[in-house]
């Protein structure tokens, strides 16, 4: 595919607001997961999450507009404003917006339905209903920055942000829009935390690929990227290829068992970028500290690569579903920008059949091409290749 430039980035993440603060979090190797203090977890098995703290939305959004936005929309608009500033100026009006979210505004939906039941349809606040839909954050981004191209929202669980990136990249490559804001948003609500705990999805520590892993840490946040056509456009990284597949053995609540299908999506992304396996300098993995998903991914990696390149697992820092998967993507972009692979937080010992050890320390390395994997419950697999150069 035609390479697409990433010309600006912005982030509201657990433990870090702003790109350089996020880069510092990754470089320190510290997890942002802490005991939950936003709601009571008494009676649950899990008690930790990666929450956004010290975020002041009024620094990014005018007070009158702020009142109309839920937490997800605030994450999205703030991240987009930072990305536009990082770019160095406003986008053309014809630009598009593509946002990803794993679950959308769950808490807003709960708040609206509670008032609907208690007060009736006539008295339930209409502004809450408007914010209860998954595309509210993307709509606010389009309105805030007067962007009149496409405006879509992808709800693909773990793969939401990478799928949104693929859509926007294709539209720019075809000349439909000159540029786009691409991002992801999600937040940790009491009801979502409780449901995931009840089905046994959550653990107390995020330990991707580690043999002692027993569940994911729930994360939240927002991230945004500016995409523009790569010809003569300098960027901090470039989008160069995508691959997709679906595992028919997966159910809505698991990731499936066919490592060959996951490997086929990785292979397709590499070929779409015009590259070979030996061109991939590292893999930014989808591993989320669940037994089944991590095993599926490492088996797929080992089946595709005879010599496995360095593998980085970032969700030990900020949990799963954080910004609809966009934080993992942003970490890979920063690796290319800074020419440094991050350590894999939470890993100490792998399973016996693993032929590789995820990165244990930050590694300064000549990085030209990174593979980013995203495997979602329900069987969807999206893989992308990011490159350092425009050609």
Show the residue positions of the predicted features.
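A glycine- and small-aliphatic-rich helix-loop capping segment at beta-alpha/alpha-beta transitions
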Residues: 20-25, 107-122, 173, 194-205, ...
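Active-site-proximal alpha-helical scaffold in enzymes
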Residues: 76-88, 134-137, 142-145, 151-183, ...
């Amino acid at each position: 595919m035609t390479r697409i430039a990433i010309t600006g980035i912005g982030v509201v993440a657990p433990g870090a607001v702003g790109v350089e603060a996020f880069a510092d979090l990754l470089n320190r190797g510290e997890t942002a997961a802490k005991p939950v203090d936003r709601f009571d977890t008494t009676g649950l098995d899990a008690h930790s999450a990666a929450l956004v703290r010290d975020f002041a939305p009024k620094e990014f959004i005018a007070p009158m507009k702020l009142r109309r936005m839920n937490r997800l929309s605030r994450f999205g608009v703030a991240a987009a404003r930072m990305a536009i500033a990082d770019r160095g100026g406003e986008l053309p009006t014809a630009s598009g917006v593509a946002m990803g979210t794993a679950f959308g505004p769950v808490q807003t939906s709960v708040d609206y339905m509670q008032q609907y039941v208690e007060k009736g349809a006539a008295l339930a606040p209409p502004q809450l209903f408007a914010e209860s839909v998954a595309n509210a954050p993307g709509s606010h981004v389009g309105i805030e920055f007067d962007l009149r191209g496409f405006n879509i929202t992808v709800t693909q669980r773990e793969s939401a942000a990478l799928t949104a990136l693929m859509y926007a990249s294709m539209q720019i490559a075809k000349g439909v829009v000159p540029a786009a804001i691409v991002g992801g948003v999600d937040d940790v609500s009491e009801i979502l935390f409780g449901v995931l705990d009840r089905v046994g999805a959550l653990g107390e520590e995020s330990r991707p690929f580690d043999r002692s892993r027993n569940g994911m840490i729930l994360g939240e946040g927002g991230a945004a990227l500016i995409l523009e056509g790569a010809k003569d456009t300098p960027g901090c990284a470039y989008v160069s290829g995508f691959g997709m597949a679906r595992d028919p053995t997966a159910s809505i609540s698991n990731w499936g068992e066919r490592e060959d299908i996951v490997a086929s999506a990785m292979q397709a992304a590499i070929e779409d970028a015009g590259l070979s396996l030996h061109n991939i300098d590292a893999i930014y993995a989808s591993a989320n500290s669940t037994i089944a998903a991590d095993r599926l991914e490492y088996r797929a990696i080992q089946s595709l690569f005879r010599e496995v390149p360095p593998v980085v697992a970032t969700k030990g820092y900020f949990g799963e579903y954080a910004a609809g998967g966009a934080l993992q993507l942003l970490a890979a972009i920063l690796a290319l920008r800074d020419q440094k692979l991050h350590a894999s937080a939470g890993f100490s010992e792998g399973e016996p059949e693993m032929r590789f050890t995820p990165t244990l320390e930050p590694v300064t390395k000549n990085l030209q091409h990174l593979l980013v994997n995203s495997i979602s419950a329900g069987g969807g697999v999206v893989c992308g290749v990011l490159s350092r150069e425009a050609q």
